């Protein structure tokens, strides 16, 4: 029996809002880079706001502090890595934050963007349990970036 269009839409919506199993992956296309650690991804016919797990970049539009130093550079690096790209979103224990954003480790091919931003020095480690799957890697990469003076660690 074939599904009617409304039934298929309902099924896809249920899959998007249901709690995800750790390690589950969803594929989509980046349609907007918001800043250094947030993107919009088209998943089927819906666009989801995705926040990178385990990392934090300086803000480009903070509600009280405005643009933070390095925010524009981090956003530009993120744009270079993901804009228009097909991505794989790897989920961890908690799938959404308190703002309703999907939380993910973002992959372009074999490159984990979260880790690459830390490695290049454009993001710092921000661990929010229970999403800690790649925490040790992020801490190691941050130490290396800081020691090498890369990205936001330059000159100070």
Residue ranges and their predicted role:
Residues 2-156:
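Small beta-barrel nucleic-acid-binding modules, primarily SNase/OB-fold domains
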